[in-house]
C-alpha cells in the first residue's frame, strides 16, 4: 500500500479518568493507549499525523517519535474539526486513515482491509454489530447501501433500534475528504463538526460508501474511565494468553497470566498462576514457572525450574538452573548452567558459576563466583562501604560456611574453605581453611537471671 496517511485524533482531555495525564497516555499493558495504535499503523502507513490538544507537550515528550507530524487542535470543536487540522499536511492523491487515540485494540489486519476497500471505492468505514449500541452513531442503510450515520443524541426512536454502529474509524481518499470536510456544519445537538457528517455529503454527491464489519467488538472499544481501562486490560491479556497457548505454551489459568511486553518461548514450557511477564523475556524449551513469579527483561534457557514467588529482572539464566522459591534475581546477574539459587536468596550484579549452590538466606552482590562452589545459609557479601560498591571473587570449588560475612573487596581462592560464622576481611588462599572466631567460653557456674 502506497501513500497512506494515518490521522490519529488524540486531543481529548479524558476528564472521567480523573488523572493529570491526558487520556491517550493512560497505560494498557505497560504501553500508552496512543502507543498501542502507533504500533498498529507502523509499516502500514507512510506518514502518521497525531492531532493533539490537552497537555500536548506531555504527549509529545512521552511518545518521543520524530517520525510523527504533531498537529495542534487549539479548540475542541468536534472530530470533523480535528481531522481538518491535519489536512494541510496531506497530499490529495493519498488515502487518509482516521483513527482514535482511545481505541487501543484495533488490529493491523482490520486496518489493512479498510484501506484496501477505500482504494477501491474512495471511502470506506468500519462498523460493528453490538447487542447494546447505546452511545454509538447508528448506520442507516437502504438496500444494503449506507445512506447516513446518525449520532445517538440526534437519532429518532426508530433509528435507536439499529444495532449496526459506526466505530468512527474510516479510510478516505484525501481529496474527497478535504472536499467533504468543507461542507459539514455544526447544526446538531452538540454544536460540533461531526466527522461522520461527511458520509451524508458523500451520499448526496453520489459517492459510494463501502464498509467492513469488525468481527471482534472489542477491537473497536473505546476508553473513557478507569473501569473501562481495566476491562480492556483483561481483554488484551486473555487475547494474548490465547495466542500463546495456540503457539504451544501451557498456562494453568490464562485468566491469571499477564504479559506486558514481548514474550518468546520454546517448546513444552509451563507457567502456573499469577505470573507476570514484563519487558522482553525469552524462555527456552522445557522451562517451568511456578505460581506468583515476576520476570522482566530476562533471557532464560532450557530445562529451568523457577519455583514460586520469585522476582527476576534483567538477567541471564542458563540451562538446567533452579531458582527459588522466594528468590530475587536483580539486574546484571548471570546464572550459569545447573546453578541453584534457593529460598530467600538475593543476587545482584553477579556471576554465579555452573553447578554452584546458593541454597538459602543469602545476599550475593557484585560478586564473581566460580563453578562447583557451595554458599551455605546466611552468607553475606558485604559489598558497600557507605560510598562505593566493591567486588567479591570466589574461586572454583570453594566452600563458604554458614553465617559468614565476606567484606569486599576480597578474593576467596580455589577450593578454599571458610569456617562457619567467620567475618573474612583478607584474601583466603587456595586449598586452605580460613576462619575468624573468638574463642568459645563456657561458664560453669553461670545461672540465668530470675524475674524479680
From Swiss-Prot:
Subcellular localization, as worded in the UniProt entry: Cytoplasm
GO cellular component: cytoplasm; membrane
Residues that bind UDP-N-acetyl-alpha-D-glucosamine: 9-12, 23, 73, 78-79, 100-102, 137, 151, 166, 224, 330, 348, 363, 374
Top-level division of the source organism's lineage: Bacteria
Binding residue positions for acetyl-CoA: 377, 383-384, 402, 420, 437
Region named Pyrophosphorylase: 1-226
E.C. number: 2.7.7.23, 2.3.1.157
Catalytic activities: alpha-D-glucosamine 1-phosphate + acetyl-CoA = N-acetyl-alpha-D-glucosamine 1-phosphate + CoA + H(+); N-acetyl-alpha-D-glucosamine 1-phosphate + UTP + H(+) = UDP-N-acetyl-alpha-D-glucosamine + diphosphate
Top-level class of the enzyme under EC nomenclature: transferase
Needed cofactors: Mg(2+)
Active site: 360 (proton acceptor)
Keyword line: Acyltransferase, Cell shape, Cell wall biogenesis/degradation, Cytoplasm, Magnesium, Metal-binding, Multifunctional enzyme, Nucleotidyltransferase, Peptidoglycan synthesis, Repeat, Transferase
Pathway info: Nucleotide-sugar biosynthesis; UDP-N-acetyl-alpha-D-glucosamine biosynthesis; N-acetyl-alpha-D-glucosamine 1-phosphate from alpha-D-glucosamine 6-phosphate (route II): step 2/2; Nucleotide-sugar biosynthesis; UDP-N-acetyl-alpha-D-glucosamine biosynthesis; UDP-N-acetyl-alpha-D-glucosamine from N-acetyl-alpha-D-glucosamine 1-phosphate: step 1/1; Bacterial outer membrane biogenesis; LPS lipid A biosynthesis
SUPFAM superfamilies named among the record's database cross-references: Nucleotide-diphospho-sugar transferases, Trimeric LpxA-like enzymes
InterPro entries reported for this sequence: Bifunctional_GlmU, GlmU-like, GlmU_C_LbH, Hexapep, MobA-like_NTP_Trfase, Nucleotide-diphossugar_trans, Trimer_LpxA-like_sf
Similarity annotation: In the N-terminal section; belongs to the N-acetylglucosamine-1-phosphate uridyltransferase family.
HAMAP family in the record: GlmU (MF_01631)
Assembly mode: Homotrimer.
Name recorded for this polypeptide: Bifunctional protein GlmU
Organism whose genome encodes this protein: Ruthia magnifica subsp. Calyptogena magnifica
